[in-house]
Amino acid sequence: MLVTCAIGGVALADPVTITDVAGRSVEVDAPVKTMILGEGRLIYAVAALEDGDPFARVVGWRDDLGKADPATYAVYQAKYPQIDAIPTFGGIKDGTFDIEQAITIGPDIVVMNLEAKGATEDAGLIEKLAAVGIPLVYIDFRDAPIANTTQSLEILGTLLDKEARAKELIDFRDSEIAKVTDRLREANPEKPLVFLERAAGYSEECCMSFGNENFGLMVEMAGGINMAKDIIPGTFGTVNPEQIIASDPDAVIVTGAEWDAYVPGGAWVGLGPNSDPEKAHEKLANLMKRPAFTGVKAAETNNVHGVWHQFYNSPYQFIVIQQMAKWLHPDLFADLDPEATFKELHARFLPVDYDEGYFVSLSED
């Protein structure tokens, strides 16, 4: 059971015990009025559950959204200019999270990504916050998103008093994933070998990828075989160029975003709302000129695609599962429209309009 109510009633804040994705039992007065987001990109989920201003309860957040996803930041900033005034924090993993600032703000809850658990424990953050009555919960859309997204949305639904809306989103997500997995199960098509390059062009080194989790698991759900699943033991890791050439993947899918804040003018593929399709296409094509892709089947046949990197860190993974399925099995999923699904997500759950720019493909040449 996710939540055990200590006192009845839902209109007022009551003590509830939440089991977070780390398996911790955390007592919280819910619904919360104020919260600090240990990562700014957690707003992807918060915005989908709040039926009003998604920043109304956010009294502090990590400064990553404007750097890692400036296009989305700009979309929300245009409608909610007050986000510029929200106090920002550094990351717990790099030691720049200001605990004293968090205590001074005094939120009802601090919400952290599961990947920060080790650093959070090393810093004694949970104990320091608990000493002043501030609970901390972990949610996860990155380390094991397929397994943890449902529970993470349920936790946020409880914290925000949006349980019904969270269930609606979970049901929508599940039904859209089933459109892919059910058809694949019935048709049982031959599965192409896929190389997933994480943040392609972010650095000159080649190549970051995914093990059997996150995008690595998503591509398997979409009817592909993740080339690196037996090479990378965890969620994230690297493969060398020789492994790519020797494996000769049928398809290549890279992740990309606007990363000028980190790597100005880099070779990365800028994807996200309102991205430049011609520029993204050109940069994707240039990435295939690297030695790691010399003579590789996917590059030779233009079976090369790019997706918005932040799908790996949001509850929107079902969109990219549909898009990858359509690329990998175009005939089987000829009637599937991932963009229409994304538009429906925006119309039903998000407070901003949908803008194109999340995908690019060389196969359209």
Residue ranges and their predicted role:
Residues 12-365:
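N-terminal ligand-binding lobe of clamshell/alpha-beta domains
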